[in-house]
């Protein structure tokens, strides 16, 4: 049994148990409230952990956005048989409705595994 620390607003979880050592993917939200808006090292990201809670990788950027390597609000995760990662995002509620003018944003992205 272990306790995993140093996560900010985890909102998505996928446990890959297809290998001998399970890997856990966790989607985190970035700062969105006045109380944490200026806090350092928070970001909209996907972290990958081993079964003991050691972070193996971090995907994403400190800033939310639609550019390559950025997330808006990861809320759903899935991994296919090739190892590609699918990230579902709550982009309208978190960001799109607040833009001037409001607009639709990406709500699903695929991250292709490179061999």
Language-model features: locations:
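Eukaryotic scaffold repeat domains enriched in small/polar residues
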Residues: 1-115
């Amino acid at each position: 049994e272990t306790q995993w620390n140093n996560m900010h607003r985890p909102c998505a979880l996928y446990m890959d148990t297809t290998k001998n050592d399970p890997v856990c993917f966790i989607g985190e939200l970035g700062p969105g409230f006045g109380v944490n808006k200026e806090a350092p090292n928070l970001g909209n990201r996907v972290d990958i952990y081993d079964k003991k809670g050691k972070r193996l990788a971090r995907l994403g950027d400190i800033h939310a956005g639609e550019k390559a390597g950025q997330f808006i609000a990861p809320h759903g995760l899935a991994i296919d048989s090739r190892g590609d990662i699918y990230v579902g995002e709550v982009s309208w509620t978190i960001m799109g409705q607040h833009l001037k003018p409001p607009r639709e944003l990406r709500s699903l992205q695929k991250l292709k595994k490179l061999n």
